[in-house]
């Protein structure tokens, strides 16, 4: 044997697992694009003045086994105390059937946001279930398919209240004083940039105020009191004040729906429906509204429509409200939400059904009653007379109680003067209540659970009669069919089969970076060491998290060329918002708060102008030249015109047009010359890592899409993570947190509910970087560039590649111009996108950043075989367009305009001018491995004109 021990140890094994093409395949591809090596190709494409001499040092790579062992040792430093802190977070029980078949299933977690509904019907149905749960429990008319977290939802409710308010001169937003503190923190952050005056007081005090456009109430206060706000809401409605209510999804199973009491909006966290606390996330927020306000709602909304055959089909409705279309005029900057977590919550409701859910809520409440009465009989005073699951217990010797709790490995809420807080959960059992009683009393007296249970069956008054829910909920068959594990498993599998995810085919979406989410990266998110921690637990109990976050932050600092990284933003859009806030606060600290203009190239992603608007900035668009690059003449003119009002520029690199702009350093210099800051959008970081870096280029701040470049899966539309890196001068202006103070958090207000955002998915990115190492990360970027150029080279004779760099190359993605084909032959980018489904592919990004185009991003994870399959499909489709051009098929009847084709058409009457085989088996590969779309092409116009965003009525099933 001629190999050394080092070679046999195979430390770089994961690199070869992550990168799809072999060395031999890469040689063939390099020859096609005219390069001798990956380094040669990189030197031909990347401007020399921004190229790093060596990749940043994040260490060597590790095997999967080594990295998992290292991370397990780190995770074991976390202390898994029983948490009764509450404050919007509670232990939850995720049924194993959902854990295995959804959360740990790549068929669910590797899908993309359902912009292509024909290949997304499974998760669209699940999201419709989520909306139905929200509608039923809140008592309102329409719901969204998730927001980022409860605190963000509160901020969105405030913004929406202002949009829909008829009191146009009012600028005050009133918040009841027993809202969760982290929610108030985020609301204040948003209000600051909108110029709203936030007033916090006891709820009834709002009636004494003028100039109030909206009110935020919390049905179950943060310290446990259950409020009947029906009368107050009625009085507020008489004054035309918009009312939002924060609600607990578990409590709503027993409590009157706020919508029935007159609330205009109801929101909260769905975490308690089977999603672990995870040190703060990810968790789906729910959001519901009255029907009359639906076009002002934030977030994605799933609607019922029909397909080309007239069959019922689902789609994302009313997209004209959203950032990718309305840009700075959008209702919100939300792009990625929390689809995977919403689907978990929806399946939790499906599995338990109405009776099961009420049983769980009833058990939580009964145990709370038992503990409450037991403590009262032992001489304790409860601060409130009403509760669902949370007690605020007054204690004479708080230090002694907390010492006993520490010894028993129990966390209580400690921030209430002269009292401790206790929130029970689905995970609480009678032995836990007995243990809590002993901790509080400090005696050997044992709580008599059985006796108190009998007493409380007839005499519990902790929920006022007026607040008890009396209506039926979750009557739809989906919540009443799948209560055995066999049925539930099959239901989830049936939905999974309707979707096209990375476990079946390449998803070549430009600007989305749909790369491998390796199994080894995903394993740690199911570990209890990461799952069970409350985000507000004492820092000494989260040492494992702190070490993991510190290491990941250090690696990201190295890779970006920045000085500090903040992990709080829980999506890319939130990262943009946080970065722009840092810029705003920096200018204010220098007495330059008048700087408010944000320059944005015309090619920018829609979140950029939407985020700038949210940050209180004025958007000024900078033109691009005919090559797709930022027009430096126009940029300088706009910067000079802005003068001392220039705040920043938001620029994506490589550009959204898919090229490395040669003048990026000049762009940075011009902005700095006029006193502005450079925000470099990290959406295309997959073409930078190890090759260049935003801090090295000259930028001041960037967000990083960990769900793109650093392997967190898209989850069908979330979760995401958008940490921001900044230069040292912006570091003091990064987000802080009102509840948790520790190293890494500033004194600024928060942008997310939890101090470290969706912390429990950060191990995915930690694993990726640890296993790839410095050289592996650079090789990944280089391979992504190679794959994109290989596609462009193979397709350029049949499709126009819209933009290239000065030497004819693209970056990590390429834009195919379909406009000439549409003008000459009548075939659109939509027709090609839908026809690709028949070939077994998800479509590239349509009409972004240029209308009438397809943007293709293959990533480094796809093999040459799969890339060739995609190229061959595109060439075959071009040949089909040729048949239309020659008149062999009419423009009205051909396999492109009729695509996609469904299985039922094989056994239906066939009147088309092309064969069934041409329709559904266009290649030999599709005969061997066919993906069948569940529906034909969606009728978008019908869906928006006949908006229906809940499950079909029960009568349809009778």
From Swiss-Prot:
<feature type="modified residue" description="N6-(pyridoxal phosphate)lysine">
    <location>
        <position position="708"/>
    </location>
</feature>
<keyword id="KW-0663">Pyridoxal phosphate</keyword>
<dbReference type="InterPro" id="IPR049315">
    <property type="entry name" value="GDC-P_N"/>
</dbReference>
<dbReference type="InterPro" id="IPR049316">
    <property type="entry name" value="GDC-P_C"/>
</dbReference>
<comment type="function">
    <text>The glycine cleavage system catalyzes the degradation of glycine. The P protein binds the alpha-amino group of glycine through its pyridoxal phosphate cofactor; CO(2) is released and the remaining methylamine moiety is then transferred to the lipoamide cofactor of the H protein.</text>
</comment>
<comment type="subunit">
    <text>The glycine cleavage system is composed of four proteins: P, T, L and H.</text>
</comment>
<dbReference type="InterPro" id="IPR015421">
    <property type="entry name" value="PyrdxlP-dep_Trfase_major"/>
</dbReference>
<dbReference type="Pfam" id="PF02347">
    <property type="entry name" value="GDC-P"/>
</dbReference>
<keyword id="KW-0560">Oxidoreductase</keyword>
<dbReference type="GO" id="GO:0005829">
    <property type="term" value="C:cytosol"/>
</dbReference>
<dbReference type="InterPro" id="IPR003437">
    <property type="entry name" value="GcvP"/>
</dbReference>
<comment type="similarity">
    <text>Belongs to the GcvP family.</text>
</comment>
<dbReference type="InterPro" id="IPR020581">
    <property type="entry name" value="GDC_P"/>
</dbReference>
<dbReference type="InterPro" id="IPR015422">
    <property type="entry name" value="PyrdxlP-dep_Trfase_small"/>
</dbReference>
<dbReference type="InterPro" id="IPR015424">
    <property type="entry name" value="PyrdxlP-dep_Trfase"/>
</dbReference>
<dbReference type="Pfam" id="PF21478">
    <property type="entry name" value="GcvP2_C"/>
</dbReference>
<protein>
    <recommendedName>
        <fullName>Glycine dehydrogenase (decarboxylating)</fullName>
        <ecNumber>1.4.4.2</ecNumber>
    </recommendedName>
</protein>
<dbReference type="GO" id="GO:0030170">
    <property type="term" value="F:pyridoxal phosphate binding"/>
</dbReference>
<dbReference type="GO" id="GO:0019464">
    <property type="term" value="P:glycine decarboxylation via glycine cleavage system"/>
</dbReference>
<dbReference type="GO" id="GO:0005960">
    <property type="term" value="C:glycine cleavage complex"/>
</dbReference>
<dbReference type="GO" id="GO:0016594">
    <property type="term" value="F:glycine binding"/>
</dbReference>
<dbReference type="GO" id="GO:0004375">
    <property type="term" value="F:glycine dehydrogenase (decarboxylating) activity"/>
</dbReference>
């Amino acid at each position: 044997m001629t190999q050394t021990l080092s070679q046999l140890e195979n430390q770089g094994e994961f690199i070869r697992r992550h990168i799809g093409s072999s060395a031999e395949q890469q040689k063939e591809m390099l020859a096609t694009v005219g390069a001798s090596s990956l380094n040669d190709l990189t030197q031909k494409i990347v401007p020399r003045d921004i190229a790093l001499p060596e990749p940043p040092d994040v260490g060597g790579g590790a095997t999967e086994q080594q990295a998992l062992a290292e991370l397990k040792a780190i995770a074991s430093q976390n202390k898994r105390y029983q948490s009764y802190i509450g404050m919007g977070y509670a232990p939850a029980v995720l049924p194993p059937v959902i854990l295995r078949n959804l959360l740990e299933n790549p068929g669910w977690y590797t899908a993309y946001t359902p912009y292509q509904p024909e290949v997304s019907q499974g998760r669209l149905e699940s999201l419709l279930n989520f909306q139905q749960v929200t509608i039923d429990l809140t008592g309102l008319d329409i719901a969204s398919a998730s927001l980022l977290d409860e605190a963000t939802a509160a901020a969105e409710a405030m913004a929406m209240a202002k949009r829909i308010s008829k009191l146009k001169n009012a600028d005050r937003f009133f918040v009841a004083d027993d809202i969760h503190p982290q929610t108030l923190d985020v609301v204040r952050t948003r209000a600051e940039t909108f110029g709203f005056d936030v007033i916090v007081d006891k709820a009834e005090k709002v009636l004494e105020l003028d100039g109030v456009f909206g009110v935020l109430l919390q049905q179950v206060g943060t310290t446990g009191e259950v409020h009947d706000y029906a009368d107050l809401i009625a009085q507020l409605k008489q004054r035309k004040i918009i009312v939002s209510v924060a609600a607990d999804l578990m409590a709503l199973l027993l409590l009157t729906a706020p919508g029935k009491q007159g609330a205009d909006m109801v929101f909260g966290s769905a975490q308690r429906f089977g999603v672990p606390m995870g040190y703060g996330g990810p968790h789906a927020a729910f959001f519901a509204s009255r029907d009359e306000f639906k076009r002002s709602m934030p977030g994605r909304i799933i609607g019922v429509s029909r397909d080309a055959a007239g069959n019922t089909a689902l789609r994302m409705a009313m997209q004209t409200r959203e950032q990718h279309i309305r840009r700075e005029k959008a209702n919100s900057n939300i792009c990625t939400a929390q689809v995977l977590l919403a689907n978990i919550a929806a399946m939790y409701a499906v599995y338990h059904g109405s009776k099961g859910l009420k049983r769980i809520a009833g058990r939580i409440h009964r145990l709370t009653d038992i503990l409450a009465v037991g403590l009262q009989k032992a001489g304790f005073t409860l601060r409130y007379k009403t509760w669902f699951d949370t007690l605020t217990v007054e204690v004479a010797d708080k230090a002694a109680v907390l010492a006993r709790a520490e010894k028993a490995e129990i966390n209580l809420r400690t921030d209430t003067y002269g009292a401790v807080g206790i929130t029970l959960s689905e995970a609480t059992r009678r032995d836990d209540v007995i243990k809590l009683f002993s901790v509080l009393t400090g005696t050997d007296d044992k709580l008599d659970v059985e006796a108190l249970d009998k007493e409380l069956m007839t005499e519990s008054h902790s929920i006022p009669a007026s607040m008890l829910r009396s209506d039926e909920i979750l009557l739809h068959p989906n919540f009443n069919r799948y209560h055995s594990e066999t049925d539930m498993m099959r239901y989830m599998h049936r939905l999974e089969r309707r979707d096209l995810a990375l476990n079946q085919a390449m998803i070549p979406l430009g600007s989305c970076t749909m790369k491998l989410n390796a199994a080894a990266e995903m394993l740690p998110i199911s570990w209890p060491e990461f799952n069970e921690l409350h985000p507000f637990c004492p820092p000494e109990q989260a040492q494992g998290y702190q070490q993991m976050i510190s290491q990941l932050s250090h690696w990201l600092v190295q890779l970006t060329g920045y000085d500090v990284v903040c992990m709080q933003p829980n999506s890319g859009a939130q990262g943009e918002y946080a970065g722009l806030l840092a810029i705003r606060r920096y200018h204010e600290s220098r007495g330059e708060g008048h700087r408010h203009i944000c320059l944005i190239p015309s090619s920018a992603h829609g979140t950029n102008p939407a985020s700038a608007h949210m940050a209180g900035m004025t958007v000024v668009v900078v033109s691009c030249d005919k090559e797709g690059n930022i027009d430096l003449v126009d940029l300088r003119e706009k910067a000079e015109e802005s003068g001392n009002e220039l705040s920043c520029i938001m620029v994506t690199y490589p550009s959204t047009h898919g090229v490395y702009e040669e003048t990026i350093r000049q762009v940075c210099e011009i902005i700095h010359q006029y006193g502005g800051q450079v925000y470099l959008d990290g959406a295309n970081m997959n073409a930078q890592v190890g090759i260049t870096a935003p801090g090295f280029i000259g930028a001041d701040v960037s967000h990083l899409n960990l769900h793109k470049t650093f392997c967190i899966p898209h989850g069908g539309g979330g979760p995401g993570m958008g940490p921001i890196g900044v230069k040292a001068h912006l570091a003091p202006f990064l987000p802080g947190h009102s509840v948790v103070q520790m190293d890494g958090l500033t004194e600024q207000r928060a942008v997310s509910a939890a101090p470290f955002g969706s912390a429990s998915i950060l191990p995915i990115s930690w694993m990726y970087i640890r296993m790839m190492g410095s050289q592996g990360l650079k090789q990944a970027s280089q391979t992504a560039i190679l794959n994109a150029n290989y596609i462009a080279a193979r397709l350029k004779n049949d499709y126009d590649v819209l933009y290239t760099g000065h030497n004819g190359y693209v970056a990590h993605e390429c834009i195919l111009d379909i406009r000439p084909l549409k003008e000459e032959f009548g075939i659109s980018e939509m027709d090609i996108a839908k026809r690709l489904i028949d070939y077994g592919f998800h479509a590239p990004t349509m009409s972004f950043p240029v209308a009438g185009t397809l943007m293709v991003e293959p990533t480094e994870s796809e093999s040459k075989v799969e890339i060739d399959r995609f190229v061959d499909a595109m060439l075959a489709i071009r040949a089909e367009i040729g048949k239309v051009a020659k008149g062999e098929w009419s423009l009205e009847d051909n396999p492109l305009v009729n695509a996609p084709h469904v299985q039922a058409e094989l056994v239906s009457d066939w009147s088309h001018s092309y064969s069934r085989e041409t329709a559904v088996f266009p290649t030999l590969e599709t005969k061997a491995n066919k993906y069948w779309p569940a529906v034909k092409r969606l009728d978008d116009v019908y869906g928006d004109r006949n908006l229906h965003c809940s499950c079909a009525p029960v009568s349809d099933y009778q």
